[in-house]
A protein has these predicted regions:
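Auxiliary, metal-adjacent structural segments of Zn-dependent hydrolase domains
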Residues: 133-174
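Fold-level signature of zinc-dependent metallopeptidase catalytic domains
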Residues: 108-134
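Short, low-complexity intrinsically disordered segments enriched in A/P/G/S/L with frequent Arg
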Residues: 2-5, 18-21
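Short Cys/His-rich micro-motifs in 6-15 aa windows
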Residues: 50-60, 113-122
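Short metal-coordination and nucleic-acid-contact micro-motifs, chiefly zinc-binding Cys/His arrays
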Residues: 28-31, 42, 81-84, 103-106
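Cys/His-rich microdomains that often coordinate metals
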Residues: 37-40, 53, 92-95, 101, ...
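Short, cysteine/histidine-rich loop/knuckle motifs that typically chelate Zn2+
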Residues: 32-35, 48, 87-90, 112-115
Length: 174
């Protein structure tokens, strides 16, 4: 028989009490920096040591990064020591993504951002802010999909059946 478990226990170190479950959608697993400080999913800098941090989709962790000059970035994780990364283009251009791209990946976008098919007009500061917020929610969704090991294919590999996101801006009716 199936055991029903509140979804918050999948990502939280400590199961929530019944009166706290309504907040479970906002809670995610925390991570630990190499300095011992707690890192959260959206962090881009460790508040303890000041190092830049980012999410590594291939390792499913938020980790501190060490710049390697022209050779990209290295995660300060023993099991990822030889791996080189670079920032997602949506981070370098708009500061809306904290996921990394492996240096041997030809795509400029991370595994989450490359699923975008349409984004709003980014010449509007309002659209950039709304897009940042919806990208944050999408990255949480994609983290959950990856963590649960659910299969998915992007539209870049399957144009008709692959997963893709169309983020449209509201239009004013004049």
């Amino acid at each position: 028989s199936l055991k029903v478990v509140p979804h918050c226990t999948l990502f939280c170190k400590h199961p929530l009490k019944p009166d706290q479950r309504r907040y479970s959608a906002a809670r995610m697993k925390t991570f630990t920096c190499c300095c011992g400080n707690t890192l959260h999913f959206e962090n881009t800098r460790c508040l303890g040591c000041g190092r830049g941090v980012a999410f590594l989709p291939d390792a499913l962790v938020v980790a501190a990064l060490e710049p390697l000059g022209d050779q990209g970035l290295r995660a300060l994780l023993p099991w990822q020591w030889d791996m080189r990364y670079r920032r997602c283009r949506n981070d370098t251009d708009y500061q809306v993504c904290n996921w990394m791209v492996r240096d041997d990946d030809a795509d400029a976008y991370c595994a989450s951002c490359r699923l975008n098919r349409v984004i709003p007009d980014l010449s509007s500061a309002r659209n950039v802010e709304l897009w940042r917020r919806i990208e944050e929610a999408k990255r949480r969704l994609m983290y959950t999909v990856l963590r649960l090991g659910l299969p998915f294919t992007g539209r870049d590999h399957d144009a008709h059946g692959g997963l893709g996101f169309r983020f449209l801006a509201d239009t004013d009716a004049d």
